[in-house]
């Protein structure tokens, strides 16, 4: 079974929930970027979150960007998703290695450090919606829980996980459960109780538990209903034309310098590492068409 996102409602629509299996997507990102295990886990968690949050977008052409910037060795993470859960992303420093933390786990908290999380929703309006909050733990799931509470005023629980062994990514996924207006205190209390000691989501996924089963474990007795199930994948939208526009955007002075150098130019996409080569003749054509 491939990666996918499931969206559910429960408790007469006062709870909405999203579950994700993203093992293949995270493994592909790790391979494309040559990520260390700790960078794989950090980027994978963020990509999983973006995939689920893309199903909160209303318009077909809407886009979601999650930016994390920390003072730890990873530096930062950028992930973009469209409304169809086509996700792409990169980490600033892909080859970070740190000792395991006191629980014997990958120390993402130290790798990310303290800083901020930025969520940008581009809905095709003049200005995108931008939400900002602090990184409170660097673990990403806790940071998004805090973001939803403070920036969007939506009480939420976010769980994200990436399980890695010597062969690579063997389990990745997550869930987001949110309280909507009208949610009863009893519902909130039941969920809080179930979350105490809840198994690791990446371990559950690696053992074959589906996102639906995970959400049903959390929402049992609340009449959970599946709203939609959609595929989720690593997909970049870079093209040679887009890279040519990037070349043009560097400005007349720098473009002329590249032309006069006579060697052409090589541009590389941050998101998928695809390289685009522009010969000296290509640069000459770009200069003729765009430099007056």
UniProtKB/Swiss-Prot annotation:
One Pfam family cited in the UniProt record for this chain: HSP33
A cellular-component GO term for this protein: cytoplasm
Compartments where found: Cytoplasm
Keyword terms of this UniProt record: Chaperone, Cytoplasm, Disulfide bond, Redox-active center, Zinc
Superkingdom of source: Bacteria
UniProt function note: Redox regulated molecular chaperone. Protects both thermally unfolding and oxidatively damaged proteins from irreversible aggregation. Plays an important role in the bacterial defense system toward oxidative stress.
Protein name: 33 kDa chaperonin
Protein's organism: Ruminiclostridium cellulolyticum (strain ATCC 35319 / DSM 5812 / JCM 6584 / H10) (Clostridium cellulolyticum)
Gene: hslO
């Amino acid at each position: 079974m491939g990666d996918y996102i499931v969206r559910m409602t429960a408790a007469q629509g006062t709870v909405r929930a999203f579950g994700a299996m993203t093992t293949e997507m995270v493994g592909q990102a790790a391979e494309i970027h040559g990520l260390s295990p700790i960078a794989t886990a950090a980027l994978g968690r963020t990509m999983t979150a973006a995939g689920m949050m893309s199903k909160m977008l209303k318009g077909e052409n809407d886009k979601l960007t999650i930016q994390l910037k920390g003072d730890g060795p990873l530096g930062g993470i950028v992930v973009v998703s469209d409304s169809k859960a086509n996700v792409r992303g990169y980490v600033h420093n892909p080859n970070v290695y740190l000792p395991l933390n006191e629980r014997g786990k990958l120390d993402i908290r130290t790798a990310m450090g303290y800083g901020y999380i930025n969520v940008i929703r581009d809905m095709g309006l003049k200005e995108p919606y931008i939400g900002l909050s602090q990184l409170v733990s660097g673990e990403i799931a806790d940071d998004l829980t805090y973001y939803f509470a403070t920036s969007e005023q939506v009480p939420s629980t976010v769980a994200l996980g990436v399980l890695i062994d010597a062969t690579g990514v063997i389990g990745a996924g997550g869930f987001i459960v949110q309280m909507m207006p009208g949610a009863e205190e009893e519902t909130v209390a039941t969920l809080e109780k179930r979350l105490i000691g809840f198994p690791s989501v990446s371990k559950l996924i690696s053992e074959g538990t589906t996102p639906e089963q995970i959400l049903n474990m959390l929402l049992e007795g609340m009449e959970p209903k599946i709203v939609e199930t959609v595929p989720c994948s690593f997909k970049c939208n870079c093209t040679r034309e887009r890279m040519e526009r990037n070349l043009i955007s560097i400005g007349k002075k720098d473009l002329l310098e590249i032309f006069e150098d006579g060697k052409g130019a090589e541009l590389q996409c941050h998101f998928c590492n695809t390289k685009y080569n522009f010969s000296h003749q290509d640069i000459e054509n770009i200069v003729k068409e765009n430099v007056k």
